[in-house]
Swiss-Prot record:
Functional summary from the UniProt entry: Mediates calcium-dependent cell-cell adhesion during the early stage of development.
Induction or repression: Expression is controlled by rpkA.
Name of this chain's protein: Calcium-dependent cell adhesion molecule 1
Family named by the database record: Belongs to the Dictyostelium CAD family.
Keywords from the UniProt entry: Calcium, Cell adhesion, Cell membrane, Membrane, Repeat
Region annotated 4 X approximate tandem repeats, chain positions: 1-194
Record note on modification: The N-terminus is blocked.
InterPro entries assigned: Ca_cell_adhesion_N_dom (IPR015059), CAD_C_sf (IPR038423), Dictyostelium_CAD (IPR052885), G_crystallin-like (IPR011024), Membrane-bd (IPR029283)
Domain of life: Eukaryota
A single MF term (Gene Ontology): identical protein binding
Subcellular locations according to the entry: Cell membrane
Naturally occurring in which organism (per UniProt): Dictyostelium discoideum (Social amoeba)
Gene transcribed to yield this protein: cadA
């Protein structure tokens, strides 16, 4: 039994048996109540170049978060039932510990693809997405201490002439290694005044562009 170095293979049965499904590095997958695969994965193989974070729930749990687990690179996980039903997971590059999932929503006009948002965490490669795109995964390395805030440069640029930047600021993210929850921190002096942020689940954030100024 094996899996590609850059993938995770989940199984319906314990001990890596039964029907299986593979997911690639950079994917964040969440199942909702009633979905075919919600709470169905019972074991998995993690490729040698990736790690995998798994959650019992995919929502922001209040007041008590569901169960959470970090699965190591190259690991064989024969019994995932301790998670009480897997509803969400992230397949991360092996050198990273956690990730934020981000998207931009255009509230300025009705034309999809009008703006491109770029987020660049400190000493980490940037990710970019356009309004109308789905969430993109932004992996973060292990910090010291692990629940430190990480500052990220945030820009939004028009994708049409004159290609002006309409946002230039920063946002902070903070991770809980106990629950796997990510929180966003907006500092008044640096967070763009023409944007708001909505948390969509335990790692996912929607950045709303409300105006160009």
């Amino acid at each position: 039994m094996s899996v590609d170095a850059n993938k995770v293979k989940f199984f319906f049965g314990k001990n890596c048996t039964g029907e299986s499904f593979e997911y690639n590095k950079g994917e964040t997958v969440r199942f909702n109540n009633g979905d075919k695969w919600n709470d169905k994965f019972m074991s998995c193989l993690v490729g040698s170049n990736v790690r995998c974070n798994i959650w019992e729930h995919n929502e922001i749990d209040t007041p008590t978060p569901g169960k959470f687990q970090e699965l190591a690179q190259g690991s064989t996980n024969n019994d995932l039932t301790s998670i009480n039903g897997l509803s969400k997971f992230q397949v991360l590059p092996g050198a990273f510990q956690w990730a934020v999932d981000v998207k931009i929503v255009n509230k300025v006009n009705s034309t999809a693809g009008s703006y491109e948002m770029t987020i660049t965490p400190y000493q980490v490669d940037k990710v970019a997405c356009k309004d109308g795109d789905d969430f993109v995964q932004l992996p973060i390395p292990k910090l010291t201490p692990p629940d430190s805030e990480i500052v990220s440069h945030l820009t939004v640029r028009q994708t049409h002439t004159p290609y002006d930047y309409v946002v230039n600021g920063s946002v902070y993210f903070k991770y809980s290694p106990t629950t796997g929850q990510v929180t966003v921190i907006k500092k008044d002096e640096t967070f763009p005044k023409n944007m708001t942020v909505t948390q969509d689940d335990n790692t996912s954030f929607i950045f709303n562009l409300n105006s160009e100024k």
